[in-house]
Amino acid sequence: MPLVVKGKVNINEFIDLSKSEKLLPSMFTPVKSVMVSKVDKIMVHENESLSEVNLLKGVKLIEGGYVWLVGLVVSGEWNLPDNCRGGVSVCMVDKRMERADEATLGSYYTAAAKKRFQFKVVPNYGITTEDAEKNIWQVLVNIKNVKMSAGYCPLSLEFVSVCIVYKNNIKLGLREKVTSVNDGGPMELSEEVVDEFMENVPMSVRLAKFRTKSSKRGPKNNNNLGKGRSGGRPKPKSVDEVEEEFDNLIEDEAETSVADSDSY
């Protein structure tokens, strides 16, 4: 049984259509159609992975048109016994963007002791149909301190999106309900147990490191990480140093005290 049921995705949590937009035919409203995608699923087998995810699965696109990714719901389930240690960070990525901090759309962190979790991300931007057909979205997964033998699947993730498909790039006439988005950067929804770690290593830094490590051509646009700055500011810790601190953090038994209720 899927973790996310299509009928349970509430469009009103992301957008608020006027009465006329709900009643009039599509030809009389700026909105061509509001759609909910089919479920796309990823089985996570590696501690660190960057995988493509189809956020528009089952969505009928318009040739020469646009699609607006209003929001998405991500559900996860740990395939582990109860009270296991460790945790995971999940980050949504737009692979077109070369700067890691601009590529990260939203991220979420949780402990393995919380068997099921669900969160929403509000990207709230549009792309062309041509770009959409290239499957531009990815998910970066980083599992920490989950001791499972290689070849098995500790975590399952499922994705459902709410989007608007339209022909002309005109004002949509929607009042978006956007929550928890900071002007200074992408949205990050955090579990208390890893707040201290994530303040030092945002997911954009992890993405930059993963891209550099995976690329045969070497680093491209992230070669300024870790350089000192003038003005007496302290030199930031390296990613490896903070990751070691995180390993020690999630070893702590207090990790199992994460709230067991699903929340956005």
Swiss-Prot record:
Organism of provenance: Tomato mosaic virus (strain LIIa)
Which keywords accompany this UniProt record?
Host cell junction, Host cytoplasm, Host cytoskeleton, RNA-binding, Transport, Viral movement protein
Name a single GO biological process: transport of virus in host, cell to cell
One GO CC term on file: host cell cytoplasm
Subunit structure of this entry?
Binds to host RBCS at the plasmodesmata; this interaction seems required for viral systemic movement. In resistant plants, interacts with host MBP2C at host microtubules; this interaction prevents virus cell to cell movement. In resistant plants, interacts with host resistance (R) protein (e.g. tomato ToMV resistance protein TM-2(2), AC Q71BG9) at the host plasma membrane; this interaction triggers host defense responses leading to programmed cell death.
GO molecular function, one example? RNA binding
Provide the function of this protein: Transports viral genome to neighboring plant cells directly through plasmosdesmata, without any budding. The movement protein allows efficient cell to cell propagation, by bypassing the host cell wall barrier. Forms a ribonucleoprotein complex with viral RNA. Binds microtubules and modulates microtubule stability. Can bind double-stranded DNA. Triggers host hypersensitive defense reaction in incompatible plants harboring resistance (R) proteins.
What family classification does the UniProt entry report for this protein?
A: Belongs to the tobamovirus movement protein family.
Q: What's the gene?
A: MP
Protein name (Swiss-Prot/TrEMBL): Movement protein
UniProt main location, coarse: host cell
- Region annotation (Disordered) maps to 211-264
Subcellular localization, per the record? Host cytoplasm, Host cytoskeleton; Host cell junction, Host plasmodesma
In which residue ranges is the amino acid composition biased (Acidic residues)? 241-255
What superkingdom heads the lineage?
Viruses
